[in-house]
């Protein structure tokens, strides 16, 4: 960090003010822009809590300077948020049952004129099993001025031997969502889905369709075509082989630490192709070298003290071709200050020297305020 940056950040601490209950009621930061280092702007974020210690309202520096707030919360006796008033998103309501599960939620309540306007509000109603584990059964959605529709339904497997064989007992096997049906055919002991089938709505091409799933025979709304993805996993739950709905297959292998070591893809009806041939890692699990099936090799270098990435080099050794050779510089907190590509040449244009590097500047809040670099004039041609 140079002298100018030291001066810029001088006397700009982050301060948190606590009340006598240990609750953070003020967050104070000091903003200074590199272009105006002599001007310091104090920015205060204000929080207010109720007598029980639950957050009641919050205002960011912009709003609190105007005497306004960003959020206002109304909570239940247990502290669950029942009503949220947002300066940007309007007002939303949430009512929970005795178990803490949402029963009704209303969003998009406008407050432009100082009072609630529900002309465009959306209401979601949740239904659960009345006995047993209380699993969700359906979600109904109602837009203001329209009839309610069931946008989602959940169907669970029973306890039969066939379902136990596929590890489906008690699992949600049929999820009817706004796009169609997502059906789980089998899962591994580790919980990894081994076979999943997707069916779309008959009117899936209509963007204005709002599905209303009936309680009986919801399959009548689905198209006949099914898309099945099958997976093979090992005893730890790591995916070894995936066959998608089009019949394309992807295989991956792992090293002794469980990190990806190779990847292969077989297009349906084609030969197997190597995507990632090998990967080397450091003791900390950071990628050091990656060799692809086309012979391209990427190497990574890290700073020993901070373990930050300081260099990435991509090349084709057989062709003696370097595609990129990036070097990174950071400030003490980890923001990227400079990225240099040694694979590119320094160019001269209109009596200007253009080096292959990007430089970034930040203010005292570590917000990006400027970025410079080289742009190829014919890049989009």
Mark where each language-model region is.
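Beta-strand elements of repeat-based all-beta scaffolds
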Residues: 1-381
């Amino acid at each position: 960090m140079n002298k100018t940056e030291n001066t810029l950040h001088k006397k700009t601490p982050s301060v948190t003010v606590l009340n006598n209950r240990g609750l953070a009621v003020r967050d104070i930061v000091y903003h200074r822009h590199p272009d105006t280092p002599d001007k310091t702007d104090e920015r205060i974020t204000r929080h207010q809590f109720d007598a029980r210690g639950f957050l009641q309202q919050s205002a960011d520096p912009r709003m609190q300077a105007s005497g306004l707030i960003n959020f206002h919360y109304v909570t239940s006796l247990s502290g669950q948020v029942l009503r949220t008033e947002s300066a940007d998103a309007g007002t939303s309501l949430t009512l929970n049952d005795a178990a803490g599960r949402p029963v009704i939620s209303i969003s998009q309540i406008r407050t432009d004129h100082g009072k609630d306007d529900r002309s465009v509000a959306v209401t979601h109603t949740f239904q659960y099993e009345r006995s047993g584990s209380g699993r969700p059964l359906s979600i109904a959605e109602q837009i203001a001025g329209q009839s309610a529709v069931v946008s989602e339904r959940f169907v669970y497997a029973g306890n039969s031997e066939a379902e136990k064989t596929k590890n489906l007992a008690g699992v949600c096997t049929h999820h009817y969502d706004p796009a169609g049906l997502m059906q789980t055919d089998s899962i591994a002991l580790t919980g990894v889905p081994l076979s999943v089938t997707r069916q779309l709505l008959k009117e899936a091409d209509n963007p204005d369709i709002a599905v209303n799933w009936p309680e009986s025979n919801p399959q009548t709304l689905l198209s006949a075509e099914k898309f099945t993805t099958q997976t093979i996993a090992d005893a730890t739950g790591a995916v070894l082989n995936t066959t998608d709905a089009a019949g394309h297959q992807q295989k991956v292998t792992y090293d002794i630490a469980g990190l990806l070591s190779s990847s292969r893809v077989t297009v349906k009806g084609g030969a197997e192709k190597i995507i990632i041939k090998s990967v080397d890692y450091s003791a900390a699990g950071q990628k050091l070298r990656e060799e692809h099936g086309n012979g391209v090799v990427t190497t990574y270098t890290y700073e020993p003290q901070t373990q930050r990435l300081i260099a990435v080099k991509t090349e084709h050794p057989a062709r003696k071709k370097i595609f990129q050779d990036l070097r990174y510089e950071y400030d003490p907190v980890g923001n990227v200050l400079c990225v240099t590509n040694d694979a590119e040449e320094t160019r001269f244009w209109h009596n200007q020297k253009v080096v292959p590097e990007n430089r970034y500047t930040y203010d005292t809040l570590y917000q990006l305020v400027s970025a410079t670099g080289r742009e190829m004039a014919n890049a989009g041609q």
